[in-house]
Amino acid sequence: MTGLIYNQHDIPKDVYRYGLRPSAQTGCGWIATYNALKLLGCTTDIPELIRYFTWQLPVIHGNLGTAFWAPRQCFRKWGFDTELIFDRRRFDEKAAEADAGIVFYHWAGKRGTGAHFVALQKTPEGFTGYNTFRNSTGPDCWGTSVDGFLRQHRYFGCVLLCIRKK
């Protein structure tokens, strides 16, 4: 799969700003949406996608990132069948049934706390995430369990968006 964004920190600070900040800081929501669209075989104009999120579904116009429900609103508007899953025990089953997914989670560490979006897909090897880590250079192997990966990394407050093709 080409054209995916593997690491938002590789986006130059003056390219693809999200609100008043660079996408490298707060752009994971639109990036996960973009990557999920690519996984679904769709194309989109990045500046147009950013404008959509910045003015219609922002958290303070993108300055604090994207609300967890915003990508679902986009995919529903575009005619995709979507489902939000809040019970992590159902993540593996539901993610395996989806054509693409987006996981939203919170993290805590030395740098404080924050939240992140990652595009996800089921592959023959297990689950693969895109733009998972600060040092990601390509697709990230999540293993055979989405829930297991999230638990291993101590991520919390997780929501899975399952997306099925039109």
Task: List each model region and its residues.
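Active-site-adjacent structural segments surrounding the nucleophilic cysteine of cysteine proteases
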Residues: 1-60
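Conserved active-site-adjacent core of cysteine acyl-enzyme catalytic domains
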Residues: 2, 43-165
